[in-house]
């Protein structure tokens, strides 16, 4: 599974923000390493931000690695219902291009427990979590991180992170290439 921050948690308010390219490059680099180790499936829940950018990275990598697949496992039906139209359209594209789509609770939003159940289900049914997360900027990813760490106490599970330092290194690499 890949997850992390939502755009507003990173101060990103449009699709042209330069930080998105840095995040996508970091995801691509890590996914390439995982593909070399046998990665076949990427799982996301369709959230805006890191998860939607992950889907875009997978689309690019599929050209080179046609065996790579991705699934969207949402916490509830119609999660995009209250989103603005451009975000809904992007979400619909992510759903349409996915190799597998399902919803954990099979009903529209009722309460926050649906997010918790989605996180539990995905952690229990995947081999690892790739998380864009920085301890100094907690935000929403802290909950799934805690859940993964607890699961790791009794299961063979990988928690891989991309933190602020990793993103800074990517930004510097990109800057050097542009010189």
Swiss-Prot record:
A Pfam family matched by this chain, by name?
A: YpsA
Cite the InterPro entries for this sequence. YspA
Q: Which family does it belong to?
A: Belongs to the UPF0398 family.
Q: Which PANTHER family match?
A: UPF0398 PROTEIN SPR0331, UPF0398 PROTEIN YPSA
Could you tell me what this protein is called?
UPF0398 protein Bsph_0756
Q: Which organism is it from?
A: Lysinibacillus sphaericus (strain C3-41)
């Amino acid at each position: 599974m890949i997850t992390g921050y939502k755009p507003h948690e990173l101060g990103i308010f449009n699709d042209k923000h330069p930080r998105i390219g840095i995040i996508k490059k970091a995801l691509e680099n890590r996914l390439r390493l995982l593909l070399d180790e046998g990665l076949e499936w990427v799982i996301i829940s369709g959230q805006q931000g890191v998860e939607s950018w992950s889907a875009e990275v997978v689309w690019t990598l599929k050209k080179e690695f046609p065996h790579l697949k991705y699934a969207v496992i949402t916490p509830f039906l119609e999660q995009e219902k209250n989103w603005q139209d451009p975000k809904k359209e992007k979400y619909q594209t992510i759903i349409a291009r996915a190799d597998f789509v399902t919803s954990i609770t099979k009903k529209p939003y009722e309460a926050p427990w649906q997010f918790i159940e989605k996180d539990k289900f995905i952690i229990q049914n995947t081999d690892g979590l790739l998380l864009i997360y920085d301890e100094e900027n907690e935000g929403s990813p802290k909950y799934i991180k805690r859940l993964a760490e607890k699961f790791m106490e009794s299961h063979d599970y990988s928690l891989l992170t991309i933190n602020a330092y990793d993103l800074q290194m990517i930004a510097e690499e990109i800057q050097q290439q542009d010189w």
